[in-house]
Amino acid sequence: MNKPKRILLYGFGPYRQFRDNITVRIIKSLPRQAGLKKIVFPARFHRAQFVEALKRFKPDMVLGLGQSARRRIDVESQAINRRRARRESKPKPISLRGRQRLKTTLPLKIGNHAGKSTSAGDYVCNFSMYVMLDHIRRYDLDIPYGFVHIPHDYDETEATRLVETVLLRCQRT
């Protein structure tokens, strides 16, 4: 029997005006399973927390979840080298020597439930994507990476089912 793939699944705690984050509820409601490492990161621009998770867990693939103000679930196709904290008027680069855009590498299919997005915004979701994809690229790691944005008011049960389906597909690939 094949050993289960090590999948790093992460989301974020509360941030800004949101006292709750749907990604926390989804991650907590998923059953424990072999090979699945679930992490809820604080919503901060702290590069080390993302790199350390990659180094410590040594995943075969990574799936990030983020809360959005959008109306539909979106699969993010790239991370952009920019970040902006609440009080900053202009975005800043995440990496002064990094590429402008980094493509996600985990082909995610969520059926008719999701759209495809080319911008994960300027906040922590995009920051985490960029930092992890940049680390994977710089160290030539064979770790497929994907990211899904889920609306903050989306049906939690349905969102959890969709994430479970994605995780099952990841185990099979």
Residue ranges and their predicted role:
Residues 1-123, 132-145, 151-173:
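N-terminal catalytic or cofactor-binding beta/alpha core of small enzyme domains
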